[in-house]
UniProtKB/Swiss-Prot annotation:
The lineage of its organism: Bacteria, Pseudomonadati, Pseudomonadota, Betaproteobacteria, Burkholderiales. The gene is phnX. One of its GO terms (molecular function) is magnesium ion binding. Mg(2+) binds at residues 19, 21, 193. This is Phosphonoacetaldehyde hydrolase. SUPFAM superfamilies: HAD-like. Binds 1 Mg(2+) ion per subunit. Involved in phosphonate degradation.
Length: 276
């Protein structure tokens, strides 16, 4: 690497791009999973919370399509309707899912412990705070209303239907780069609790941090998390790590409260000329 190239490398972070459910709000990412179960039940198809969590991180229509591609779920649908689920059937389930999600999402969107304090500290450092979500814009509006009441605010928000192609494609992360006026994607960190969300950051050229215990991968409520002893937490970490590694995160931590030491390490690596 020549001196001119080194001179153009960022020497400090410029921005973070956060996911929402399971990352900043909704410990355990329960709002979408429970509604997926209920939406499929309206069509006579029974799915488990574990099945509902499988494609988490995708846009919600894509998530339903992925669930319908599951052999066991598709078989139930065929028994009910005499055919495998088509894209039109996926849309019908999505149209049933959306109002149910709108009704319930704010109820689950309590900030994750440490998130508000973290964001306040990052702002004091002059970092820009972006975000994106697998939720469509209508649902995100409900999340943002609750977040604002709780004192949790970011500089920019992208919903899954704001871009032509959602996760794991990089469009939502890169929309943040453009709108926040970021000079170099290597100065950005993507923080997410799902493998597609981590992969989104990777494809966008960012540093990536996966969250082991606050989100979809572990699937623990805050009460369950707090009740675990260290052996229980380590077992949950192992389960989540196996899932999140599919997105190839640069770092894995328990929750956003553990992010500051990671950011310090990234800044050290940037100063040494490293890139994601």
């Amino acid at each position: 690497m020549n001196a001119m190239t080194l001179a153009t490398l960022p020497v400090r972070l410029e921005a973070l791009v956060f996911d929402w459910a399971g990352t900043l709000v909704d410990f355990g990412s329960f709002a979408p999973t429970k509604v997926f179960v209920d939406a499929f039940a309206r069509f006579g198809v029974q799915i488990s919370l574990e099945q509902a969590r499988g494609p988490m991180g995708m846009g919600k229509w894509d998530h339903i399509r992925a669930l319908c591609n599951d052999a066991a779920i598709a078989r139930q649908y065929q028994e009910q309707f005499g055919r495998l689920p088509t894209d039109e059937d996926v849309t019908a389930i999505y149209e049933r899912f959306l109002p149910m999600q709108l009704e319930k999402v704010a109820e689950y969107s309590q900030p994750i412990p440490g998130a508000i304090e973290l964001l306040h500290g990052l702002r004091q450092r002059g970092l820009k705070l972006g975000s994106c979500s697998g939720y469509p814009a209508a649902v995100m509006q409900r999340v943002l209303e609750r977040a604002e009441r709780e004192g949790l605010a970011l500089d920019y928000v992208v919903a899954s239907d704001d871009v032509p192609r959602s996760r794991p494609a990089p469009a939502m992360a890169l929309r943040n780069v453009v709108e926040l006026g970021i000079a170099d994607v290597a100065g950005c960190v993507k923080v997410d609790d799902t493998a597609p969300g981590v992969e989104e950051g990777r494809r966008a050229g960012m540093w990536t941090v996966g969250l082991l215990l606050s989100g979809n991968a572990a699937g623990l409520s805050l009460e369950q998390f707090l009740s675990l002893d260290e052996a229980g937490r380590e077992a949950a970490r192992d389960r989540a790590r196996a899932e999140l590694q599919a997105g190839a995160p640069h770092y894995l931590i328990d929750t956003v409260a553990d992010l500051p030491p990671v950011l310090a390490d990234i800044e050290t690596r940037l100063a040494a000329g490293q890139r994601p």
